[in-house]
């Protein structure tokens, strides 16, 4: 098996749970995913099968989410699965006040990861250390938020705001909910999250975990999933050099140090790095 699956992750399980279930269903050990989703979250989870796992680092880092922020409370996990650590209500909050604060969360921003996250500190996941009662100091990270669009506003004692967010890898929507609530002085936590796009895959073409089986394997090709890369078709002579790890002389390559998808007879044979008139093998896939 070789290729990608556009999996619609269900709520209540981890991304690794999905991998384990697919290994059982497909009787295939070599399976990986292209970006962790929290257990409460649903939506697009790119899955790589077989040697396609070697292409996971080259997925587009652009992701899109629909998230609902609940104001008037804060939680230990920055989402509604955590314990409430502050609760004051926010019935006075208006959409106009929120819209005044949103621009500061667009662009390159500093973001402090949630205490309960998969980031490793001193070889341990943050969530494991938090569950053990440790308070770990983690420096903020620079993340990119390309766009925030308001989809729905529901006033009330604990008003809720639904947003369409487009961002880069490493952005925590939970942290965005927390920080927006802090900026408004009322607290905020993430009430719901769906990833609608990741690695070039969209929710409209996703498949449920229950529907995937060896006899029903809706694979996407590397060319589809890595459509953000330029692609180059090799001839037979170039392919021989490629398979032996030698740089291939090519015309019309993109600027130096660009990633390029490589095919032969329309089949993906890897990824290279451009350098002048030569393409240097980075990932070589052989049949």
Swiss-Prot record:
The keyword DNA repair does not apply. This is tRNA pseudouridine synthase B. It is an enzyme of class 5 (isomerase). Pfam families: TruB_N (PF01509). CDD domains: PseudoU_synth_EcTruB (cd02573). Its EC number is 5.4.99.25. Belongs to the pseudouridine synthase TruB family. Type 1 subfamily. InterPro entries: PsdUridine_synth_cat_dom_sf, PsdUridine_synth_N, tRNA_psdUridine_synth_TruB. It catalyses: uridine(55) in tRNA = pseudouridine(55) in tRNA. PANTHER family: PSEUDOURIDYLATE SYNTHASE TRUB1, TRNA-PSEUDOURIDINE SYNTHASE. Signal peptide: none annotated. The keyword Iron-sulfur does not apply. One of its GO terms (molecular function) is RNA binding. Gene3D superfamilies: Pseudouridine synthase (3.30.2350.10). One of its GO terms (biological process) is tRNA pseudouridine synthesis. Keywords: Isomerase, tRNA processing. Responsible for synthesis of pseudouridine from uracil-55 in the psi GC loop of transfer RNAs. SUPFAM superfamilies: Pseudouridine synthase. The active site is at residue 38.
